Design a protein with these regions (language model features):
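Glycan-recognition and catalytic cores of secretory/periplasmic carbohydrate-active enzymes
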Residues: 21-253
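Bacterial Sec-dependent N-terminal signal peptides
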Residues: 1-26
């Protein structure tokens, strides 16, 4: 009986190994097909939400406990992710309806190009207008990127060598590791405008971050607070992570 059981196991494993595995292309096609369906459904639900609250700019954030959409104003730091996702699906599928959806949600983000009170405009604009420019060469998007980068650069302090992350809280000059994501906007705008100052700001921020955010084991702190008068490090800590001496996974990635 034991031999019979082992024989069944052997043949089960043998035939399982002979089954054709899904290729990477097939997997990618399947994932994008699913993503396209989900994003199209989200667009429909967002239209319904906008009708219910017409005075708000509607950007998807999450879901509430009752299953309804949790939406946010364009100033929310993740507002560029949805139009950015639509641009990626358009790029992969070539389906113009996703291009039109991306443009519909992207246009509400244009006022961000003149915001100087936070650092998130880097990926808010690069996800949306950055992908639009990359895929189409659109001149309006090009201008938005340059204006946005110059707004972001106003948060740079040459004594510290970084752009400031937040204007709230008990810190003096907080810089979070996530701020590295915003350097793409500075570098792209420097390339488009030949504005060397934007490139210098990006490189200085990267060098200062490399020097002060990383430990000997190459894990990183979430937040480093600086003295803007001297550039000295005041404190290294976390704000949203597990502990001050833990690694900030999102920044580490």
């Amino acid at each position: 009986m034991r031999k019979f059981g082992l024989l069944i196991l052997f043949f089960s494993l043998f035939f399982a190994s002979c089954q054709r595995q899904e290729t990477m292309q097939e997997l990618t096609d399947r994932v994008f097909e699913r993503a396209a369906a989900q994003l199209a459904l989200l667009d429909y639900n967002l239209d319904s939400a906008a009708l219910a609250v017409p005075e708000q700019a509607i950007y998807p954030r999450s879901t509430n406990q009752d299953g309804s959409l949790w939406t946010s104003h364009y100033k929310w730091w993740g507002s560029g992710f949805y139009p950015g996702s639509l641009w990626y699906v358009y790029e992969y599928t070539g389906d113009v309806k996703f291009k039109n959806m991306a443009l519909k949600y992207q246009v509400g983000l244009e006022p961000l190009k003149f915001r100087t009170d936070h650092h998130d405009i880097g990926f808010q604009l690069m996800c949306s207008y950055g992908n639009h420019f990359r895929l189409t060469g659109d001149t309006i998007s090009r201008s938005v990127l340059i204006d946005g980068a110059r707004s972001l650069a106003t948060r740079f302090d040459p004594e510290v060598g970084c752009t400031r992350s937040w204007d709230f809280g008990k810190w003096t000059f907080p810089v979070i590791i996530d701020n590295m994501m915003n350097l793409e906007l500075l570098l792209k705008a420097a390339e488009l405008s030949n504005d060397r100052n934007l490139k210098n700001v990006a490189l200085a921020h990267a060098r200062t971050t490399m020097k002060n955010h990383f430990r000997e084991d190459n894990s990183c702190f979430h937040l480093v607070d600086y003295d803007p008068q001297t550039g000295a490090v005041l404190k290294k800590q976390t704000h949203q992570g597990y502990a001050d001496d833990s690694a900030w996974a999102r920044g580490q990635a």
